[in-house]
Amino acid sequence: MVIFPKNIDGYKKLIKISTFASRRGFYYYPRIDYKTLKSFWNDKDLKLAIPFYDSYVFNNTLYSNLCVPELDFTEPVYFLEDNDLPFDELVTKKVNNLSKNTQKTQSIYYKNKKDFKAYLTYKCINNRSSLDKPELDHMTSNEFCVESWKEKNNG
């Protein structure tokens, strides 16, 4: 999930959420439970977004996970992406069944297509794997860059 501040009060709430997650919810990385998040929440100041690839919808669809987040305190916006990957259509259908509150987005991880190998090397180092066998699901496209986004949007 991604939390966006809508104004200065939202920014202040986001700092409180982040501080709580870092100090009281830390377990290898900052985290917060839904009950606590709900206690900080105000739709006037904050907006919740559900990413396309790194989300419960994606994991439930592709890996048969059974995550059901408690989102009764807000109406999140769901990000949609189309990167010509085989599962994009499956996840898009699931998202559209969940909500009409969607926004087309594009994940960007590096600047140019030629930078993909450097990005993959970085991911392999973090994953403790090698370029010969990266063991990174769906890391098959060099289209997650500014260059590809410009091509799609500027003709």
Which positions does each model-derived feature cover?
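Phosphodiester-processing cores and adjacent nucleic acid-binding clamps
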Residues: 1-155
